[in-house]
Design a protein with these regions (language model features):
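N-terminal secretory signal peptides that target proteins for export/translocation
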Residues: 1-5, 40-43
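Short, aromatic-rich amphipathic segments at membrane interfaces
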Residues: 656-658, 726-742
Length: 769
């Protein structure tokens, strides 16, 4: 009895000390052998390392999750599950992963007896079966949430509970509240894990990720088919070692990721910089994101001289590879280009440029002076001082500092002033200020469309400017007020930028320039998301906006068929989209769709070169127009001279001859169609002389069931906001353990858990004697 009493007292003391250590441990962080793929603040937890053959319990705590949904689909969201202690089942990792997006053993306690550590990070490690189950439809790898210190190559035995969770939650900083990602898949992981080292083992052979990649994400939301569905193919590799053969880079590093193609990729023709352009109904699933960290500098055409090996994970609604090696990129030699279009006396040159949240506020996180100079120099040296420059994303004078100001005159004039300082050329600026807070964009910034013009080359039609809510109208073919916004009170323009119409005169001829920044793609489904088929939820709004703008142009041409209309801007939609088709109708020519296919892009996002910026011209002058995108930004990082996230696009219109009669010919009608093939990397990058052609309407059918989830700058800015919201500080609350997607246990439950662990330890120790 004395011995039993002594043991009970020792157990109670151990329990108390363990509870106190649980709080004390929050003051320390242990960093594993390799850095994590997240830049988030780590959860603050210690661990106790042990020698080979010893056992250590993970400090993870598992409870019931908050979110419950139907489990009828293997692509569903997290379902509630219990983590009550049960006898573990010995399985291979492939059995845990299963032939589905979710584990068939979710919520169950399992034991893995013969695995090797393939990669570590601050929150746990990746393990893979030493002997595969031979089933290519199931992954042999898994992520283990644990602070137990292991090294790559350690042979381990693991006991833990199967969980479908989020890597964003695992890497969440201490004291921050987790917000479940919208439309995001989960990652199969082990939590509440016990780890036993058992010597070392060689790493399994990495799977060539390019070799088996399907060409699309199929629209069957329930069937699991990794042979033909890219989403399921990625799932079949989740947590496994993979390799990309000597990849080349497709675009600039963004948020720590680069997109690449392996040297063995043969699926599609490449564009003129070795990338893949978006095309109708093509998702470019072969592009592979690799995490490299946000200090890594890379641009399009750079390459790796050796294979890149890493494990597959999923976060922020897409799969990626986290390398297991130090990467060194080689310079591929891509240079920022200058426009081939040169100024000409009888030719009107118009540029469209998204200058990415530009204001007169020169604070570091607003528009610093070096950015002003970069953009001004791009006007001077890369696009050769156009006569008219339409500006997208001009903010009010204070930038994002919200003091109720809506005027952006100081912002526009600051850019004009910098151009004059650098080259001596004078530009004037015009705009119509929005209603405060009514046009979307960065909070407090009131972004709008603005126009710079050279008064020595063009004259602004002398009219009173419209107010924010006055709609642009024509009288005898001329704007009643100038400038004016198109249908500012139309519901399709709620909380987004209103198109700006400005009438100029060039060589005695009227030219109406309409600057546009249509509804962003924020809210569209991700290709690699829960919702399948993915849907472009924002497309109907852009289609409605396009219809309003087109009707406005129709009315102007009806009143004066000789007026030249030029529509410029960031349309937040592709050159082959139904939005572009509606805009063009029978009156306008879609210039980008006529351009060389291998050079047809102005933006880069998630692996694809794409068109968001475009110019449309009325058919009465289309045959006299030369168009080109000027690739100075989208493929580059700031370190290479990038001034914005968009490339400018440029049109030059020859007014030296007679204007084509106002009524378009059959060949000039409906020019939103285009060829979809791409050229080889040696394709010409010159400007394109345009001849309108009949629309290929069969390629322009509206489809909200097949999304090309390749969103633009505002989507990325929204991601920043969502990430900030995900990591909102919780006053007075501090998480001690890495989050596992379940409620933080109460203190009493924690004490019971520690007591139980102590008892287990005691029993095991007793059994060894």
């Amino acid at each position: 009895m004395r011995n039993n009493g002594k043991k009970i007292r020792l157990l109670a003391v151990a329990t108390l000390l363990a509870s106190q250590l649980g709080v004390f441990n929050s003051a320390f962080t242990v960093v594993a052998d390799e850095t994590t793929a997240s830049t988030s603040e780590p959860a603050l937890v210690t661990n106790t390392s042990s020698e080979d053959g010893s056992t250590n319990h993970s400090t993870s705590v598992t409870a019931t999750t908050e979110v419950t949904t139907s489990a009828s689909s293997d692509r569903g969201e997290i379902a509630s599950s219990s983590s009550e202690d049960t006898e573990e089942k010995t399985v291979k990792i492939g059995e845990i992963q299963g032939e589905a997006q979710r584990s068939p053993l979710e919520g169950q306690k399992v034991a893995i007896k013969n695995a090797v550590v393939t990669k570590t990070d601050r929150y746990g490690f990746y393990a893979q079966d030493i002997e595969s189950d031979g089933n290519s439809r199931t992954s042999d790898g898994i992520y283990v949430v644990s602070k137990y210190k292991v090294k790559v190559g350690d042979k381990v035995k693991i006991t833990g509970t199967v969980k479908e969770g989020y890597m964003e939650e695992v890497t969440l900083g201490a004291g921050k509240t987790f917000k479940e990602p919208t439309n995001s898949l989960t990652v199969t992981m082990l939590v509440d894990a016990w780890i036993t080292k058992d010597g070392t083992a060689p790493l399994p052979e990495a799977v060539n990720i390019t070799a088996g990649m399907p060409a699309e994400v199929k629209i069957n939301p329930t069937a699991y088919d990794p042979e033909t569905d890219a989403l399921d193919y990625w799932e079949s590799l989740e947590g496994m070692l993979t390799v990309v053969k000597k990849p080349h880079v497709l675009g600039p590093q963004y948020k720590g990721d680069i997109y690449v193609l392996g040297e063995d990729f043969t699926g599609l023709p490449l564009n003129n910089i070795g990338g893949l352009n978006l095309r109708p109904h093509a998702q470019n699933t072969a592009t592979i994101p690799i995490y490299v960290g946000n200090q890594f500098v890379a641009k399009a055409k750079d390459y790796f001289a050796e294979d890149v090996t890493g494990v597959v994970t999923y976060r922020n609604s897409f799969y990626k590879v986290e390398p297991t090696q130090q990467l060194t990129v080689q310079d591929g030699g891509l240079q920022r280009q200058a426009a081939q279009t040169q100024p000409s006396e009888d030719k009107l040159t118009i540029a469209s440029y998204n200058i990415e949240n530009f204001s007169a506020n020169n604070a570091k996180n607003e528009t610093p002076e070096d950015k002003v100079t970069l953009i001004a120099n791009s006007f001077i040296h890369e696009i050769h001082n156009p006569d008219i420059i339409t500006l997208i994303e001009v903010q009010d004078n204070n930038g994002s500092v919200d003091v109720g100001t809506t005027s952006g005159l100081e912002s526009g004039r600051k850019l004009a002033s910098r151009i004059k300082e650098l080259v001596g050329k004078s530009y004037e600026y015009t705009e119509v200020a929005p209603v405060d807070g009514a046009d979307g964009g960065k909070p407090g910034s009131n972004i709008r469309l603005g126009i710079l013009y050279n008064p020595e080359r063009v004259s602004l039609a002398k009219k009173e400017a419209a107010t924010s809510n006055e709609a642009a109208q024509f009288d005898k073919g001329h704007l009643v007020k100038n400038p004016a916004r198109i249908a500012p009170n139309d519901p399709s323009f709620d909380h987004t930028r209103k198109s700006l119409a400005v009438e100029f005169e060039f060589k005695g001829k009227p030219v109406v320039v309409i600057a546009n920044h249509l509804k962003s793609k924020i809210g569209d489904d991700a290709i690699y998301g829960v919702s399948q088929p993915a849907v472009e939820h924002t497309l109907p709004t852009r289609e409605a906006q396009a219809s309003v703008i087109h009707q406005f142009v129709q009315e102007g041409l009806k009143q004066n068929p000789k007026t030249t209309f030029v529509l410029t801007g960031d349309f937040n939609d592709y050159d082959f989209s139904t939005t572009a088709q509606i805009l063009a109708g029978n009156e306008l020519t879609n210039l980008m769709s006529q351009h060389d296919a291998g050079d047809r892009y102005s933006y880069f996002y998630r692996g694809s070169n794409q068109v968001l910026d475009n110019i449309f011209i009325s058919n009465n002058m289309a045959a006299k127009a030369t168009f080109e995108p000027v690739h100075i930004n989208a493929s580059f990082m700031k370190e290479h001279g990038r001034a914005s996230d968009h490339d400018p696009v440029l049109v030059q219109i020859d007014f030296s001859g007679a204007q084509i009669p106002g009524t378009p010919t059959d060949d000039q009608k409906g020019n939103s169609g285009q060829a979809t093939e791409q050229t080889s990397p040696s394709s010409s990058n010159t400007g394109t002389q345009l001849v309108p052609h009949q629309a290929q309407a069969n390629e322009q059918k509206s489809s909200t069931s097949k999304s090309l989830e390749t969103t633009k700058d505002e989507d990325e800015k929204q991601e920043d906001k969502e990430e900030a919201a995900t990591e909102t500080k919780t006053p007075g609350k501090r998480k001690i353990l890495p989050s596992t997607g379940q409620e933080t246990s109460y203190l009493a439950l924690f004490g019971v858990a520690v007591a139980t662990m102590s008892l287990v330890w005691y029993k095991k120790k007793r059994m060894t004697h």
